[in-house]
Amino acid sequence: GKCGDINAPCTSACDCCGKSVECDCYWGKECSCRESFFGAATXL
């Protein structure tokens, strides 16, 4: 399965994020994570 667009939520095919990070998903197998605004409010 491929990721959705860059603004799409994480899916099982691109499940690199949790409550503290967001996925930047692309049309491929590459996926990068970054801190989300809401996740930053809660320390890891």
UniProtKB/Swiss-Prot annotation:
Keyword Disulfide bond: yes
Broad class of the protein's primary localization: secreted
Cysteine pairs bridged by disulfides in the record: 3-17, 10-23, 16-33, 25-31
Cell location: Secreted
Family matches, as InterPro entries: CNTX
Record's keyword terms, sorted: Disulfide bond, Ion channel impairing toxin, Ionotropic glutamate receptor inhibitor, Knottin, Neurotoxin, Postsynaptic neurotoxin, Secreted, Toxin, Voltage-gated sodium channel impairing toxin
Membrane-spanning ranges: none
A Gene Ontology cellular-component term: host cell postsynaptic membrane
Tissue: Expressed by the venom gland.
Entry GO MF terms: sodium channel regulator activity; toxin activity
Role description: Insecticidal neurotoxin that reversibly inhibits the N-methyl-D-aspartate (NMDA)-subtype of ionotropic glutamate receptor (GRIN) and inhibits inactivation of insect sodium channels (Nav). In vivo, is highly toxic to insects.
Family: Belongs to the neurotoxin 03 (Tx2) family. 05 subfamily.
Domain comment (free text): The presence of a 'disulfide through disulfide knot' structurally defines this protein as a knottin.
Name the UniProt record assigns to this protein: U9-ctenitoxin-Co1a
